[in-house]
């Protein structure tokens, strides 16, 4: 598997299982995503995030003590 530097799967895999729905909802709101499919496309890094989007994603993960977010 190749590494995708725009993917935030690394951070996602560090989340406690009981927090994934909450974090998904928050990221979808921050990025104004309407469907889970678009969320997973973003999580896999198929679309490069804007700087403001990357900062939002980092801030959300940081609240859960996760700082190593990008790549997978």
Residues of each region from the PLM?
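A short, Lys/Arg-rich alpha-helix, primarily the initiator
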Residues: 1-26, 66-71
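Non-catalytic effector/regulatory segments
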Residues: 3-4, 32, 61
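Alpha-helical residues within the helix-turn-helix
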Residues: 29
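Short alpha-helix boundary/capping elements
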Residues: 32-35, 65
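Recognition helix of helix-turn-helix/homeodomain-like DNA-binding domains
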Residues: 34-49
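DNA major-groove recognition helix of helix-turn-helix/homeodomain DNA-binding modules
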Residues: 51-68
């Amino acid at each position: 598997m190749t590494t995708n530097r725009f993917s935030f799967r690394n951070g996602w895999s560090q989340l406690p299982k009981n927090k994934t729905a909450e974090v998904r909802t928050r990221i979808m709101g921050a990025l104004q995503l309407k469907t889970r499919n678009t969320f997973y496309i973003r999580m896999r890094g198929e679309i490069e995030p804007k700087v403001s989007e990357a900062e939002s994603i980092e801030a959300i993960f940081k609240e859960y003590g996760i700082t190593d977010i990008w790549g997978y």
